[in-house]
Amino acid sequence: MALLQIAEPGQSAAPHQHKLAIGIDLGTTNSLVATVRNGQAEILLDEKERPLTPSIVHYGDNVTVGYDAGELASRDPQNTIISVKRLIGRSLNDVQARYPNLPYRFVRSENGLPLLGTAQGNVSPIEVSGEILKKLTALAQHRLNGELLGVVITVPAYFDDAQRQSTKDAAKLAGLNVLRLLNEPTAAAIAYGLDSGREGVIAVYDLGGGTFDISILRLSRGVFEVLATGGDTALGGDDFDHLIADWISEKSGIQPQDDQQKRLLIELAARTKIALTDKPQVSLSYQGWQGEMQREEFNGLISGLVKRSLMACRRALKDAGIGQSEVQEVVMVGGSTRVPFVRDQVGEFFQRRPLTSIDPDKVVALGAAIQADILVGNKPDNEMLLLDVIPLSLGIETMGGLVEKIIPRNTTIPVARAQEFTTFKDGQTAMSVHVVQGERELVGDCRSLARFTLRGIPPMAAGAAHIRVTYQVDADGLLSVTAMEKSTGVQSSIQVKPSYGLTDDEITQMLKASMENAKEDIGARMLAEQRVEARRVIEAVLSALLDDQDLLNDEELSTVKNALVSLDNLQQGTDTQAIKAGIKALDAATQEFAARRMDKSIRRALSGQSVDSL
């Protein structure tokens, strides 16, 4: 059975109220959460005004996340999960082959995925990631003091489907509505506003604490395409720290004797690295030894690692079929790109000055926040980030072969719109959803995209069910259609690419046909609408006669039946006004019948009740 529309999509009570959304950079070493306030993206700080949350989870008597968990890492390494991002979406065999020296107690799950044995039992990487996301969500809700409508979470461009789905599952555990997973390099480019700049090739050089990633993107018509990715999962700022620590041990002649001393030495090395970002030399003190490190010495130590990263850049460019001179912008991401030597070497390699004006630790989260702000509808259409539009209206078939447009043509994507529909017949338990594309008024003149059926609608009177149909088009032009019966929550959905197989010429022809046939289409629509209304009225009267025909005398019954036959004949014709008149005639013929049925219902309802009880 096709659909009968009952409601226009209404605006919220406060359509211009700013909707709360966040962007999360779920990092290997650290994670951040950001939002857009007063038109500006900003990082949300924790209770101690810190922007970063260490991606560390400790399982003890309680679950601890962040800095507090990090302090327990050296004392209780088996229950302190660090860099879980390396494990998510991977099989246990893959994890053990890639990272043979991890201190965790691994347990194989039934599907071959890793579980980590902790003081609180076995936990999956998804659950660990979920704890980090819960921490970030709580931080955001505290700072924003309101309900979050959704989140954009960033993932590496090279993440496969399993890793992306696992990230979504972690977000679900944290109670988050994921608006979109966004590639980290794309988020960084968005933060710099490159999405609205000239088209061309962008390189994103991401050197974090534990990993290095290079991504080559092409911007075309507001859409980022990942041309190639590369990197090194064992190269990052932590390696810089270890090189400095080894240098200090060698210069001082003092080797750390236990884990505590090793940790203190690494912390000293990290402080030295940070200080050398701004100073040409740094004074050092280690267990009674006094020394000094020059920036040139530091550059010499890390030179080999930086060259390794540039070799990965060269391979990525080759994979993309792009020359170094074709790269128009280079975006720096990750705290380790603050090192002046790294910036100089990258600039020399790509033959242009890298973009460094945004804090490289924050740039990905800021881009995610900008995207989230748009996806919840805070930006007007002319400021949409992703500039693709829907070339032809997307609609749904309603009763009588009519088209109800859900998303009009030229709407900027991503976009989501919904309308409510109801059943046409008593006891109807299923509904056919026919998705169409085009500008014409009748289904037969539009392009059919997909069909699916919503089953499990509770049997009720015609018009009593409420089915919400949602059309959502993502940034890649993929249309998801979901139909949900509101009282039970039962739903069904389908995905389709509206642009698949559609040429520019066909779009032009369809638009031209809609303009040329506009008058005839409106007339056909009015006729179809009157036919639908006539059939609805006929169905209702026949059902009433089946139950209460005895309320009419022979003459009255004959009058009603004659009006029914007349309307049935008229609705098979093509005279819209005649059908309209026939509906009015049947309505007039059944008014007394309707009044008697109402009286009967009232008497039945009051049967057996005393006057005092009323």
UniProtKB/Swiss-Prot annotation:
Keyword ATP-binding: yes
GO process annotations (BP): iron-sulfur cluster assembly
Keywords noted in UniProt: ATP-binding, Chaperone, Nucleotide-binding
Single GO molecular function: ATP binding
Presence of keyword Lipid metabolism: no
Family affiliation: Belongs to the heat shock protein 70 family.
Protein name: Chaperone protein HscA homolog
Organism: Actinobacillus succinogenes (strain ATCC 55618 / DSM 22257 / CCUG 43843 / 130Z)
Phylogenetic placement of the source organism: Bacteria, Pseudomonadati, Pseudomonadota, Gammaproteobacteria, Pasteurellales
